Structure formats: C-alpha cells, structure tokens
Amino acid sequence: MEKVIELKNVDKHFGTNHVLNKISLTINSGQLVGLIGPSGAGKSTLIAAMLGMLRLDGGQVRLLNSDMPNRSALQNIGYMAQNDALYGNLTGLENLSFFGKLMGLSRSVLTDKIHLVSQTVDLQDHLDLRVSQYSGGMKRRLSLAIALLSDAPLLILDEPTVGIDPELRIKIWQELDKLHQQGKTVLITTNVMSEIETVDRLLMLRDGHIIADNTPTFLEKQYQVTNIESVFIKAGERYENNSHI
C-alpha cells in the first residue's frame, strides 16, 4: 500500500513549549483518518508541519513521495485551514472560481465542480453574496467547498465542521466517505467526538504526543468503553499517569 504521509521524529518547539514531541507516523493511500485532541494539543501545528508551513526543530516529513516543504506537491493536496483564507470583497462564486482557476481546472470542469460542492455544503443559494456578508459558519462551508474543488488524491481538513449544524455535518461526512470510497486519502481534525466513529483510523494527540492510534472499534474495546468520548478521557488519564511515573 502506498505511503501518502510519512512523519519521522517530527519535533517542534515554540519557546519552551514542546508542541510536537518526536512524532512518527505513516498514513497509507485510501485511508480516512481522524485526528482529535484537546485545545492546545498541537493538532493544527501537526497539520502545518505536514504541509511544510513551519520550520521543524527536527525530523522529516514526506507527502505523496515528496520531501516537504515542496510547493509542487501542494498542488496535489486539497487543504482547508482552521482559519478561513477568503476574499471578503468577492462573492462566494468568485472565490470558488478564483481558487478553482489556481488549481488549473478548466472552465467547463470548474462550472460542474462549483455546482457540486456548493450543494454539498448547502451554499448554492448564497453564491452571489459577498463573503463579507457571510456568517462564520458560511465561511467555513465555503472554505470546505474550495478544498473539495480539486481532484487531489489527498485531502487535509482542519476542523471543517466547526460552526456547522448537525444535519449539514452529516451531509459533509457522507461526501467525505464517498471520496474515501473513491480511493482518496482524507485526514480530518475535529473536536466533535460523535462524528469520528466512522473513520478507518483514529489518532489522539495530547501534549505533542500521539497517545492512541487504531480503529475506533479497537480503541473502544481496548479501554472497555462504548464511545470515543470515553476513549478520549481514558487514554488521557493513562497518558497523565504514565507521564508522572
């Protein structure tokens, strides 16, 4: 199975804060992977490290067989940041068109893709509004739509369902599962424990360490609980106990 993401001893400090502590992991093609952790655990920093957006203090990152940072490799990644990078003076449609052209999509393909992704995130009736008039949740949905525009083999989505109502979250996860079934690799961070049950593989990050890595079902059996929220609590307690030994 092809390795899509490879991290070897990835290390990062911000001053005296050890944000990523020699993290090593491999994500293979076609996997749907969830990354969870408390606020400040290092999730967004780990994503930034994967994408070559920050200078590491140690370790190596490879994405799609390319050493990072690598600008050309980024063209094969659909990325949604935690902070929306949108043009407020443009409409939703103009934002989608602009980013789609940057991805190299032809006009005919782009038209079809915009129709599809705007329906997926339920923005089809709001594309003519300036983004400055969008609510926070609408901006998140537009950012997700932009990430879904490309036919990239790898999607990295940093908390894409924050501020989105439960019904639409279900629809978005159905779309992500469809892309996963098509063979795409999807890495998603979230704090919504209930929606992470459907992933192939769950990573739990705490204090810059991966403290759990397996399927949700395996982890629930390992910790003798019935939901991921309880796994999260139990794994955290075990980590805290071991770290003080």
Predicted regions: what is each one?
Residues L51:
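Helix-to-loop junction immediately C-terminal to a conserved catalytic motif
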Residues L56-Q75:
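Conserved ABC transporter NBD signature motif
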Residues L155-E159:
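Catalytic Walker B motif of ABC-type/P-loop ATPase nucleotide-binding domains
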Residues S97, K101, S108-H126:
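Conserved ABC ATPase "signature" region
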Residues D213-N214:
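ABC ATPase "signature
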